Amino acid sequence: MTKDKKKKDNVRYMDVEFNVSMHCNDCERKIARVISKFKGVETFVTDMINHKVVVRGKIDPNKLLKKLKKKTGKRVKIVVKEEKGEESSKENENVLEIDMESICLGDQSMFGFCDWEMEKFMVFSDENVKAICSIS
């Protein structure tokens, strides 16, 4: 086997749950930034209250673990590894979608504000001087 085939064998589509020490919104943002830049990540959900991050995609969990430890300086542990086969249950996908919706549709998103709330204020702000208000 060549090195390319070995690398492809280790990388599979999976859901991985990490236990990450997060105590404030800045910690959560830093972790989200590192995970979003990692190659192969499709979606991720951070839960600051339970100190957990669920990552879904074609990733090598050990590489992501090392990257999170190095970039954030936090204690990180792998909690669950689930490989997705052809007969994957849709319950896990639905739970992840519900978690994503609850984070975005709640009072605040994981970054402290919702995008749709900010759009209302940005339409007629002082920074957007070319905004046109036309009342028909």
From Swiss-Prot:
Top-level taxon of origin: Eukaryota
Would the keyword Lipoprotein turn up in this protein's UniProt record? yes
Covalent lipid adducts (S-farnesyl cysteine), residues: C133
The family database entries (PROSITE patterns) matched by this protein are listed as:
HMA_2
Any GO MF annotation of the entry: metal ion binding
Q: What Gene3D superfamilies does this protein map onto?
A: 3.30.70.100
List residues modified as Cysteine methyl ester.
C133
Where does this protein hold a metal cation?
A: C24, C27
Keyword field: Lipoprotein, Metal-binding, Methylation, Prenylation
- Per UniProt, residues of the HMA domain are 13-77
The family database entries (InterPro entries) matched by this protein are listed as: HIPP4/7/8/17/18/19, HMA_dom, HMA_dom_sf
**UniProt propeptide residues:** 134-136
PANTHER family in the record, alphabetically? HEAVY METAL-ASSOCIATED ISOPRENYLATED PLANT PROTEIN 17-RELATED, HEAVY METAL-ASSOCIATED ISOPRENYLATED PLANT PROTEIN 7
- Family from the record: Belongs to the HIPP family.
Function according to Swiss-Prot or TrEMBL? Heavy-metal-binding protein.
Name the record gives this protein: Heavy metal-associated isoprenylated plant protein 19
> Native species of this protein?
Arabidopsis thaliana (Mouse-ear cress)
The gene designation is: HIPP19
